[in-house]
């Protein structure tokens, strides 16, 4: 798991475009470029094949509200990489990095996430990573720098979504969770499968140095 460099911003952009599952905001390429410049764009790489298997983005609201808001989204994993808990792990890393490591966080910044009705995949990952539900939210065109028309049902003008906000008091638990993953699980995720046990080793040390997880 790594931060996406400015020169690499199209890698997660084209990955999401290629999967085209219709459950995510259709963010323009420049949103990924801006996130990469701000060190708020992440991707997961299979180092054996050198192929991208997952993405995540923290996108600024772009307006001048007294309370800053950022949208945590773009959470997409290749179907073959699902079921390992990688999405949950990525969101934890994103939030710990954003708040503890990036140097860009401000105490009044709100980190929001929205999940479209019927898309249950990200719910567990968000809850595991310290987000709490804030109820139904209607997202209108222009609320975020992204195209949402493909998510609007016939005859309506909004997208019905479930809203979540990050609980800043959860950051200590997330740091502890990542420390245990590195020091007790040795960065290994194991899953039993009818074809045999599968072990996945995850390294995110270039995003959060292990020494920064010391408790």
Question: Where do the PLM segments sit?
Answer:
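Conserved beta-strand-loop-alpha-helix junction that forms the acyl-donor binding cleft
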Residues: 109-123, 140-144
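Active-site rim helix/loop that mediates acceptor-substrate recognition in acyltransferases
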Residues: 19-48, 57
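C-terminal "cap" of GNAT-fold acetyltransferases
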Residues: 139-214
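Conserved acetyl-CoA-binding loop-helix of GNAT-fold acetyltransferases
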Residues: 77, 83-100, 124, 128
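A short beta-loop-alpha structural element at the N-terminal edge
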Residues: 1-14, 171
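Glycine-rich phosphate/pyrophosphate-binding loop shared by adenosine-nucleotide-utilizing enzymes
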Residues: 49-55, 70
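Conserved acetyl-CoA binding element of GNAT-fold acetyltransferases
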Residues: 66-79, 114
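Conserved active-site alpha-helix within GNAT-family acetyltransferase domains
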Residues: 103-104, 117-136
